Structure formats: structure tokens, C-alpha cells
């Protein structure tokens, strides 16, 4: 159990301290991953950026992820085949559902990044952070997107997730760090005392603060 997202970030930090700050980049999955990643990037003194991925929900059950779609010129769709089979959705159905999520990805890119270019990832140790995962569809999509940028090492860092999801992610990156894998996992929010919604303004402020920190350091 975590007090809040910042405490989760502090506990993940203990596992990430050995990383070389000269070659590490922290990426957060908005919105819930930002307060977790904020603590880590601030303490390590490394760049913080985001990976824009949207969950694609099952029609009538939007909380159940059948896929995830990424940002970019050629958005990538990562399908949870087990969920798709149970829901009776083929890849054409999922592609149509994913297309509906693209406007929200574009909206978030505009308000979060305000035209700032992404932090270069080639040759870096890249850590992707979220506040927790259930099916892993969003994290899996993020890992595949970032892998195409040729990082030297790719790590997923999550406070809480089901053991089966963590096992499925291990083939997608070099290392998975997960602090808690409860046998009775039902929802991420149940493992936090304070799991309030993270606003767009909070995300934007965190990103802006880290961008200023790096700019000031380079002067």
C-alpha cells in the first residue's frame, strides 16, 4: 500500500539510484505517472519527458483495455489478444476504436509539451514510469514505441501490478521493476490511500518545471 503517488516515486527511486545520471532519461505515462516520475527525475537530476499512449477500451466497458495506441506520425496499436478474443473484436474493429483516441493524444501533446521537442533517447538508459498497471497494454505500447528510438537500456518501473502482467512485460524491455505484485490485485487505485485524479494543469506544471531545470543547468 502506498500513501500517494509521490511516496510510490520515492520508493521506486531507491531501486533506481544506481543508474548513471549522465545517461539516464525518465519517461512518464500521463497523467498518473507524472507525480511518480517527478520525484525520481528530480532526485536523480535527469531529464523528464512523457510518452503519449491512450488505452483503447472495450465498447461498453471502457475501463477494460483491449489495446493501446501511441502518438506519432504512424500511430502504433498494441492489442491485448486475450481481451480481444473474449470481447469478440477483430483487428479492424480495434483499429476503428483506436482512431477515436487520436484526437485526445493530439490535445494532450499540445497542452503538455507546447511545441517542445522530445528528449533524445538514442543510446540512453530510458526508464518508463507509471503509477501502476493492470493489463499492461499501455506500458507495452510505450515500451515498443521507445524501443524504436534505440535506447542503450530500457526499463519499466511500476509501483504495483499483477504478477502475470509483469511476467508478460519482461520480454518487452531489459528490466522490469515492480515494488508490489499482490495476489488479489483488482485495481491500481486500491493500492493507494490517496489516488486523486491528476489534472492536465498538474502534468503541464511538472513538465514545465523540469524543462526549466534542464535549461538553467545548461547555462
Place the predicted regions along the sequence by residue.
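PRPP-associated nucleotide enzymes
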Residues: 1-219
Amino acid at each position: 500500500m502506498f500513501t500517494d503517488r509521490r511516496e510510490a516515486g520515492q520508493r521506486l527511486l531507491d531501486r533506481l539510484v544506481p543508474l548513471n545520471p549522465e545517461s539516464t532519461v525518465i519517461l512518464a505515462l500521463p497523467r498518473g505517472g507524472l507525480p511518480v516520475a517527478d520525484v525520481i527525475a528530480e532526485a536523480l537530476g535527469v531529464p523528464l519527458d512523457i510518452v503519449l499512449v491512450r488505452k483503447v477500451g472495450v465498447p461498453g466497458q471502457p475501463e477494460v483495455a483491449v489495446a493501446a495506441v501511441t502518438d506519432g506520425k504512424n500511430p502504433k496499436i498494441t492489442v491485448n489478444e486475450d481481451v480481444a478474443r473474449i470481447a469478440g473484436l477483430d483487428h479492424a474493429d480495434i483499429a476503428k476504436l483506436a482512431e477515436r483516441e487520436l484526437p485526445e493524444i493530439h490535445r494532450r501533446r499540445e497542452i503538455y509539451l507546447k511545441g517542445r521537442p522530445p528528449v533524445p533517447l538514442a543510446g540512453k538508459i530510458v526508464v518508463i514510469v507509471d503509477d501502476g498497471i493492470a493489463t499492461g497494454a499501455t506500458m507495452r505500447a510505450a515500451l515498443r514505441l521507445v524501443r524504436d528510438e534505440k535506447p542503450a537500456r530500457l526499463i519499466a518501473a511500476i509501483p504495483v501490478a499483477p504478477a502475470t502482467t509483469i511476467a508478460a512485460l519482461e520480454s518487452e524491455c531489459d528490466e522490469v521493476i515492480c515494488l508490489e505484485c499482490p495476489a488479489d490485485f483488482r485495481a491500481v487505485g486500491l493500492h493507494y490511500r490517496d489516488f486523486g485524479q491528476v489534472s492536465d494543469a498538474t502534468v503541464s506544471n511538472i513538465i514545465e518545471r523540469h524543462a526549466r531545470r534542464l535549461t538553467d543547468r545548461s547555462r
